[in-house]
């Protein structure tokens, strides 16, 4: 279904931009709006004809009531979007990903008649696969085979492709093969590797786009299509066209196979029976279509719930469509939805459901994976597996794959521990970095504050300079004007300026950078103090001390309680009374006391050390604090001095300004007097006389003084003043800088002196306090020693008592053994009973669990049904609101139109009466002037013709009004019926919802009762388990005490045997590895020499080929520019010839090549050969690197072995000591096992000798390591050269990819131009038809040239006019009758 009608062209030619994706595998949605059919209302932004508008390229607005709804998608295509832009936005990326091994799917979804088939295939014509308006599927074929040919050209014979096509349809939930017209209903099956597939579907191999077109057209003829009231060719089934792409790439002996599927799906549109008016078979088809689409919607909602973290069952198997496309919905595929919507207001409900469906689908995320398989001979595959395992082990151990550093290789058992350690270290580093980041951010804020203060300081300096310059300029102006004394206003202004300058100086002092710097240092010192207090060692020491104090207090309480009990108890107790005071408890208490004493001593030492450290740090910090306080006070004094100095400077400046003004006023006169005195000296005769007479001649002096000062002299004076000022300012600044430096030095020295003084005083205080503390501690220790001696004597007396008690306890133990045997028998009987009860309870528990699961499933199904009903109810409610509003608008419009029509009808009646009168007058005039005024008769006849036309128009209008009135009455009755039906449905839905709510409440109550019963059962089970565990613990404790000594001896023997066997195996493996390493070193050196020669030759060839490539690329660019200019010149004359029929060139299904394609192909082949050579070299390099890594791993293993040997030697020593202890124990217990211990000693000595031999082997391996390092350095240089070659190859690849993208852009632009020309040709045809029709009409009008023919024509018109008048009168009478009947109805 095309936009507009089937086959109508679109209007926009600009390509759409590629869609941005937030996540790579999320389902993307493209919304396309179908243009409205010609003749329908096409209002703008919510007028009567449209129910939605596209606001931008990603947002769409639905005109729902009471407020419009906004939807956002990946892209929204408006009415004027063309087919090429849809393909470039939707299918291009999917086809490219299919070439890379990913599965891809494109869906077209929407209501019937919304343009799905037009979007996917194109217009419904025979040549739709070569038409300029062809759809997404034909364009995908062209692009796919173009990419395949490009890959074949690049890879040569090393890569091959196989494409297979299948075309099926799902009709009434049955699968049919469209490529086999005789096929019956097919079945779906599931395979582990293939996934879901159709059994027996024909798969045809295709090698070009033309063959794929043939397959598609052959299947399309068999597809079920029928006409409905909404669409002339409506799809009655879901069509799925699948292209399977298999690529096979051979590299050496390995074969890499990639397979992918491209599913192009044209879904049948959702239908409503009242809109399509289907019956019989068509109604059944619509039901099955709607059922499968509702299943698709349920699957999508379930997938959205799963993505949000809810556990849901996804019902793929409820529909054949969802089961077949399972991977495309939340599986292994990249999916694109094209949602086609109709903008008409009649399709509001379906448009809303389509947009909601697309919005839900946008939330689904697929997990696309490259479908790849590798085949080859066993040796190659084993090498590949080995390489991958090594990379995996390096990644697990925290190394990069390319890192060739010697590191310890962890064993398989230690991998998890290493991973955990690495993880913990990483988390610690992260926390540390976060803390450092916070500290640095605080510092940055402080530095920014300091910078702001410096800027303010600079601004204040500028303001001061500005004030001074203004003052100087004002004084100069006053001097020029000749007035020295200032007025009151000027004095006030001057005072205000001085006050402003003082204020700026104060701000300068406040924002002085030194003050800010000292504040920053103070803040950092406080932070350091906090950090020292929050150190882990300090906290740990405090925790340890607190724990020790608590333990000591607990022990003291226990001892005091036991002493009280002993005092109360009699001295000689019977064995039954002394059951609680056993010998074991006494031994434990002794051990505990010893442990506590040792821990107390260590904790005291740690506490003292920590105390000393903290005291030292506290002293340092206090001294620093005191020095900072003093420095702060000193700075405050400096600030006060600066303020006073500034005030003094201001007063001095005022005086200087006054003095300078006086100087400026006086200096010009003086200089002028001097000049006038020197004038007489110019004449030699009057020189002595002039010198003598100048003071005497007063009149002459007055004349000179009264003369005006020349401007040159005043300028010289001003320049001299300015230079003096500048020199003074420079001197002041230099002195200020020196003063600042001296002040800084003074402050630092003062701080150091203060620090030293404080340190000395605090150290003296500490020394005195520590001396007093030591004296107190010494006295306390003496008192403790005395108390401990007393306790020792008491303990000796207690030991004597306990020895006597031991004998009694042994007798008690024998009786306890007898009792234990009886208890064991009772326990076995009790255990059997408990097991029976447990089995019964477990069976009951399983039954209850099954019932619970059933109830949960029922609850979930009810919730799903409720949700679906609620969604349907909401949609119906919105549709009802929208339709009611539309009907109200239509009724109001029809009323308004009726009123206008009535007014027009009355006007027309009046006109008719006037026309009648006029006609009567004209007829009388005609009878009187028949013979004399033929010309006037002709004019009257013309007017009569005009009146006839008006009458005919009035008649047609009346007829239309009558029909419209009938239609409005019918629409009113139908709308009333619809409202009644909707109200009934609403009430029915409310009743259903109420029933469902009641059922849910009943189920909830049953669930609550069942949960309570389950809780009771679980409590009973827990009680039984606790009793059972208590009994088991008692039994295990009794067993462990008996079996521990036997296990220790057996474990020692087994450990020794294991270590001996492991050492022998390791020794043999090391010898084999050494021999293998020497052989591989020799092979590596030979291969290395060969590689050097090969590299030199390849470098020369690469330089030559780069020159050739640069020359050819320049030629290709020139040729492409020429071709583009030629094509533009061809297009221009084609567009200018509007009168001639437009002959469009057939669009190439695959892009055509230019004359230099062969040269580019040769270059590409050379490039591929170079790539193959480089890949071979890289493989050899990687294999050698692997060998080096393996050798280094062996070296690491040997080092580890050496370390283990050392550890084992230490263990052996420990074992010797343990064995000596064991010997002593065994001599006491058994005198029959000395031979076994001697054998163990001999075995240990053998192990030590073997370890020594292994040490010698490690030395030999270290020598090999040095040789390997030399070879590694040589290989690094070769790697560098290889990297340069690979960079060059990457550069050529990027240039080729750039050229390809440019070519594709030009092709898409050309496609758009072709579509535009098609549209223009269609418009030309329409205009030609209109011109022909107008020419015919004009010929009819101009045909009556004879006056007799005109008179006959007028007579005919007169007769027709009379008939029309009669009919008009009849219609008027009928209209009056209708009005009266309506009035009667209203009265009734």
UniProtKB/Swiss-Prot annotation:
Tissue: Strongly expressed in testis and weakly in lung (at protein level).
Record's keyword terms, sorted: ATP-binding, Coiled coil, Cytoplasm, Cytoskeleton, Microtubule, Motor protein, Nucleotide-binding
Any GO MF annotation of the entry: ATP binding
Domain (Kinesin motor) ranges: 26-364
Residues binding ATP: 110-117
Subcellular compartments: Cytoplasm; Cytoplasm, Cytoskeleton, Microtubule organizing center, Centrosome; Cytoplasm, Cytoskeleton, Spindle; Cytoplasm, Cytoskeleton, Spindle pole
Coiled coil residues, start to end: 369-1383
Gene Ontology biological process: centrosome separation; microtubule-based movement; mitotic spindle assembly
GO (cellular component) term, any one: centrosome
Principal location: cytoplasm
Necessary for its targeting to microtubule minus ends, as annotated region: 1139-1388
Region: Disordered, residue numbers: 1127-1156
InterPro entries the UniProt entry points to: HMMR_C, KIF15/KIN-12, Kinesin_motor_CS, Kinesin_motor_dom, Kinesin_motor_dom_sf, P-loop_NTPase
Gene3D superfamilies noted in UniProt: Kinesin motor domain
Summary of the function given for this chain in its UniProt record: Plus-end directed kinesin-like motor enzyme involved in mitotic spindle assembly. Required for centrosome separation and maintenance of spindle bipolarity during mitosis.
UniProt-listed PANTHER family: KINESIN-LIKE PROTEIN KIN-12D
Subunit record text: Homodimer. Dimerization is required for targeting to microtubule minus ends. Found in a complex with tpx2 and microtubules. Its association with microtubules and targeting to microtubule minus ends requires tpx2.
The family this protein is said to belong to: Belongs to the TRAFAC class myosin-kinesin ATPase superfamily. Kinesin family. KLP2 subfamily.
Record's protein name: Kinesin-like protein KIF15-A
The organism of origin for this protein: Xenopus laevis
């Amino acid at each position: 279904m095309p936009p507009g009608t089937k086959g109508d062209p679109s209007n926009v030619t600009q390509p759409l931009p590629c869609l941005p994706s937030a996540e790579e595998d999320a389902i993307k949605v493209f919304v396309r709006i179908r243009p409205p059919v010609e003749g329908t209302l096409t209002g703008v932004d919510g007028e009567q004809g449209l129910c939605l508008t596209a606001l931008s390229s990603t947002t769409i607005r639905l005109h729902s009531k009471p407020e419009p709804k906004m939807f956002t998608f990946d892209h929204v295509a408006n009415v004027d979007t063309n087919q090429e832009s849809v393909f470039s936005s939707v299918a291009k990326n999917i086809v490219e990903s299919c070439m890379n091994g990913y599965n891809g799917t494109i869906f077209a979804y929407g209501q019937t008649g919304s343009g799905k088939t037009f979007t996917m295939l194109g217009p419904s014509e025979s040549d739709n696969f070569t038409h300029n308006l062809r759809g997404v599927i034909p364009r995908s074929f062209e692009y796919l085979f173009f990419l395949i040919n490009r890959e074949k050209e690049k890879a040569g014979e090393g890569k091959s492709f196989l494409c297979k096509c299948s075309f099926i349809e799902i009709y009434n939930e049955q699968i049919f093969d469209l490529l086999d017209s005789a096929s019956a209903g097919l079945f779906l099956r599931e395979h582990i590797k293939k996934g879901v597939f159709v059994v027996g579907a024909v798969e045809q191999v295709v090698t070009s786009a033309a063959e794929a077109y043939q397959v598609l057209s052959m299947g399309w003829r068999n597809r079920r299509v029928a006409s409905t009231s909404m669409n002339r060719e409506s799809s009655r089934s879901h069509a799925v066209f699948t292209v399977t792409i298999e690529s096979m790439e051979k590299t050496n002996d390995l074969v890499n196979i990639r397979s992918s599927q491209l599913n192009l799906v044209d879904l049948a549109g959702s239908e409503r029976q009242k809109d399509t008016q289907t019956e019989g078979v068509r109604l059944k088809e619509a039901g099955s279509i709607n059922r499968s689409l509702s299943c698709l919607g349920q699957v999508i909602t379930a997938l959205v719930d799963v993505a949000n973290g809810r556990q849901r069952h996804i019902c793929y198997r409820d529909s054949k469509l969802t089961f077949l496309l399972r991977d495309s919905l939340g599986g292994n595929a990249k999916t694109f939805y094209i949602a086609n919507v109709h903008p008409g207001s009649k399709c509001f409900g379906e448009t809303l459901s389509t947009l909601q469906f697309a919005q839900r689908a946008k939330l689904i995320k697929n997990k696309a994976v490259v479908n790849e398989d590798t085949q080859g001979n066993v040796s190659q595959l084993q090498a590949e597996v080995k390489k991958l395992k090594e990379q995996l082990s390096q990644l697990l151990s925290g190394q990069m794959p390319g890192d060739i550093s010697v590191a310890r290789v962890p064993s398989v058992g230690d991998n998890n521990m290493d991973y955990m350690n690495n993880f913990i270290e990483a988390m610690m580093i992260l926390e540390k970095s976060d803390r450092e980041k916070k500290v640095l951010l605080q510092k940055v804020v402080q530095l920014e504050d300091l910078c702001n203060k410096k800027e303010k300081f600079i601004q204040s300096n500028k303001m001061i300079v500005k004030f001074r310059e203004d003052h100087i300029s004002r004084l100069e102006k006053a001097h020029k004007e000749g007035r020295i004394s200032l007025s009151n206003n000027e004095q006030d202004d001057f005072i205000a300026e001085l006050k402003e300058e003082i204020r700026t100086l104060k701000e300068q002092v406040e924002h002085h950078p030194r003050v800010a710097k000292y504040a920053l240092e103070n803040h950092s010192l406080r932070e350091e103090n906090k950090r020292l207090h929050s150190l882990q060692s300090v906290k740990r020491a405090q925790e340890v001390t607190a724990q020790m104090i608590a333990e000591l207090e607990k022990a003291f309480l226990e001892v005091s309680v036991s002493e009280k009990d002993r005092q109360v108890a009699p001295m000689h107790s019977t064995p039954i009374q002394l059951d609680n005071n056993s010998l074991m408890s006494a031994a434990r208490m002794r051990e505990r006391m010893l442990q506590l004493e040792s821990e107390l001593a260590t904790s005291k030492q740690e506490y003292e050390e920590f105390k000393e450290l903290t005291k030292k740090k506290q002293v340092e910090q206090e001294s620093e604090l005191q020095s900072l306080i003093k420095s702060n006070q000193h700075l405050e004094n400096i600030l006060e001095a600066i303020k006073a100095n500034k005030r003094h400077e201001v007063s001095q400046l005022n005086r200087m300004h006054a003095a300078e003004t006086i100087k400026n006023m006086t200096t010009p006169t003086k200089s002028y007097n001097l000049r006038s005195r020197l004038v007489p000296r110019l004449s030699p005769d009057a020189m002595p006389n002039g010198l003598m007479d100048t003071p005497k001649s007063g009149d002459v002096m007055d004349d000179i003084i009264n003369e005006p000062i020349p401007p040159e002299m005043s300028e010289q004076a001003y320049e001299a003043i300015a230079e003096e000022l500048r020199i003074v300012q420079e001197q002041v600044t230099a002195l200020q800088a020196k003063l600042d430096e001296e002040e800084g030095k003074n402050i630092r020295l003062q701080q150091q002196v203060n620090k030293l003084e404080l340190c000395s005083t605090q150290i003296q205080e500490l020394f005195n306090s520590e001396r007093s503390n030591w004296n107190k501690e010494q006295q306390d220790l003496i008192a403790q020693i005395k108390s401990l001696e007393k306790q020792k004597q008491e303990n000796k007396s207690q030991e004597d008592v306990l020895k006597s008690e031991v004998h009694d306890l042994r007798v008690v133990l024998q009786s306890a053994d007898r009792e234990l045997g009886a208890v064991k028998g009772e326990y076995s009987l009790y255990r059997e009973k408990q097991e029976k009860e447990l089995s019964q309870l477990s069976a009951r528990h399983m039954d209850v669990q099954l019932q619970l699961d059933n109830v949960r499933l029922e609850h979930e199904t009810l919730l799903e049904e409720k949700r679906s009903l609620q969604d349907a109810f909401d949609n119906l409610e919105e549709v009802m609101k929208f339709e009611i509003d539309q009907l109200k608008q239509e009724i109001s419009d029809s009323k308004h139109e009726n009123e206008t029509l009535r007014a027009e009808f009355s006007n027309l009646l009046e006109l008719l009466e006037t026309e009648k009168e006029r006609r009567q007058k004209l007829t009388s005039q005609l009878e009187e002037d028949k013979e004399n005024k033929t010309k006037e008769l002709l004019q009257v006849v013309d007017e009569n013709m005009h009146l006839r036309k008006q009458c005919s128009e009035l008649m047609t209008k009346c007829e239309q009004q009558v029909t419209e009135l009938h239609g409005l009455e019918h629409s009113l009755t139908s709308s009333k019926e619809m409202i009644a039906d909707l109200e009934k449905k609403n009430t029915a839905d409310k009743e259903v919802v109420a029933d469902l709510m009641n059922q849910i409440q009943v189920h909830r109550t049953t669930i609550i009762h069942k949960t309570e019963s389950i809780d009771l059962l679980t409590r009973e089970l827990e009680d039984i388990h606790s009793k059972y565990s208590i009994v088991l613990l008692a039994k295990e404790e009794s067993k462990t005490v008996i079996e521990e000594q036997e296990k220790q001896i057996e474990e020692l023997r087994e450990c020794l045997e294991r270590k001996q066997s492991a050492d022998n195996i390791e020794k043999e493996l090391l010898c084999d590895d050494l021999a293998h390493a020497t052989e591989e070193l020799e092979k590596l050196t030979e291969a290395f020499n060969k590689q050097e020669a090969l590299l030199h030759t390849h470098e020369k060839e690469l330089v030559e080929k780069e020159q050739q490539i640069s020359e050819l690329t320049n030629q290709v660019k020139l040729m492409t520019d020429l071709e583009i200019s030629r094509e533009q010149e061809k297009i221009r004359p084609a567009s200018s010839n509007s009168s001639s029929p437009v002959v469009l060139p057939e669009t190439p299904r695959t892009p055509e090549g230019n004359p230099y394609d062969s040269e580019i192909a040769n270059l590409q082949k050379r490039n591929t050969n170079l790539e193959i050579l480089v890949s071979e070299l890289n493989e050899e390099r990687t294999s050698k690197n692997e060998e080096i890594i393996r050798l280094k791993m062996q070296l690491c293993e040997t080092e580890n072995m050496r370390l283990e040997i050392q550890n084992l030697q230490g263990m052996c020593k420990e074992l010797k000591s343990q064995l000596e202890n064991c010997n002593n124990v065994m001599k006491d217990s058994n005198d029959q096992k000395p031979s076994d211990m001697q054998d163990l000693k001999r075995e240990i000595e053998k192990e030590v000798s073997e370890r020594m031999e292994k040490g010698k082997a490690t030395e030999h391996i270290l020598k090999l390591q040095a040789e390997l390092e030399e070879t590694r350095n040589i290989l690094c240089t070769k790697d560098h050269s290889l990297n340069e070659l690979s960079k060059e190859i990457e550069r050529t690849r990027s240039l080729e990819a750039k050229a390809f993208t440019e070519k594709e852009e030009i092709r898409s632009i050309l496609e758009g131009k072709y579509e535009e020309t098609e549209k223009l040709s269609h418009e030309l045809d329409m205009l030609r038809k209109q011109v022909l029709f107008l020419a015919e009409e004009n010929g009819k009008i101009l045909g009556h040239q004879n006056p007799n023919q005109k008179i006959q024509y007028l007579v005919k018109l007169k007769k027709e006019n009379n008939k029309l008048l009669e009919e008009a009168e009849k219609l008027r009478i009928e209209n009056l009758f209708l009005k009266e009947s309506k009035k009667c109805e209203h009265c009734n």
